[in-house]
């Protein structure tokens, strides 16, 4: 806590290079982060005089992303704060109301898992969600598929299992109630879906003796990410041209970025 309290952001500078191949433009950040502005400006000038960028390495790999676990109360509150700007108390109050309306399981849970016997009821709950407008199409697509069991663990279920929707479909809900219900229902669909499969390309470039890096990813199979269709936080989603080690690309531009160090929350 004291470290957080005494944390002072520090300025640093990074170079952002633009290059292109086959009319596909992309940007790459310098591997170096400069504590002082002048060395960064000096490097900027050297790069401006260069006309080409060399491709040093190109690495491609397939990345599998397992779906997130089901919500416990704390993770629901965090998500509702991030996505809906709801306070923790407001989220709990709405979840309590949904529970009293027999629409979701007991909200004051510290577990993100369900037991095997509850898992056996999940297919029936998913069939119910086929009638819910926002998720109907996705839920119907899960019919007959093997469900992901990452959130199923009898040993990790505490007094109450993770948050899931019940067999009762909502009739009328206020907007805030609907928002929380859809977070829980959507997470339930995500948790029991297939993994997301991506092709990730990492490229290292060199210009005037300075190294630059860029990542791009192409989703091969969206899996659980198709529920909300949201991009991953901080995801490198650059559209990259096909590059090979040793390629020489024309330099399109270079700029200096001023940034601040930030505190990492764990």
Residue ranges and their predicted role:
Residues 1-264:
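Core catalytic DNA strand-manipulation module of type IA topoisomerases
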């Amino acid at each position: 806590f004291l470290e957080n309290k005494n944390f002072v952001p520090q300025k640093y500078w990074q170079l952002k290079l633009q290059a292109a191949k086959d009319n596909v433009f992309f940007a790459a950040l310098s591997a170096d982060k400069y504590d002082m502005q002048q060395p960064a400006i000096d490097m900027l000038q050297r790069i401006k005089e260069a006309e080409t960028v060399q491709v040093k390495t190109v690495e491609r790999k397939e990345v599998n992303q397992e779906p997130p676990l089901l919500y416990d109360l704390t993770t629901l509150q965090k998500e509702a704060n991030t996505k809906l700007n709801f306070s923790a108390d407001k989220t709990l109050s709405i979840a309590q109301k949904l529970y009293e309306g027999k629409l979701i399981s007991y909200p004051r849970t510290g577990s993100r898992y369900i037991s095997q016997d509850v898992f056996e009821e999940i297919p029936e709950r998913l069939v119910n969600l086929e009638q819910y407008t926002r998720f109907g199409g996705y839920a119907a697509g899960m019919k007959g598929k093997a469900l992901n069991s990452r959130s199923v663990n009898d040993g990790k279920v505490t007094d109450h299992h993770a948050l899931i929707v019940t067999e009762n479909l909502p009739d009328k809900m206020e907007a805030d109630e609907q928002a929380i219900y859809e977070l829980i229902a959507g997470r339930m669909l995500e948790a029991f879906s297939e993994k997301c499969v991506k092709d990730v390309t990492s490229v290292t470039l060199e210009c005037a003796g300075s190294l630059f890096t860029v990542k791009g990813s192409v989703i091969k199979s969206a899996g659980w990410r198709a529920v909300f269709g949201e991009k991953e936080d901080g995801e490198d989603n650059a559209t990259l041209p096909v590059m090979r080690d040793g390629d020489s690309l024309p330099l399109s531009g270079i700029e200096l970025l001023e940034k601040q160090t930030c505190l990492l929350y764990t």
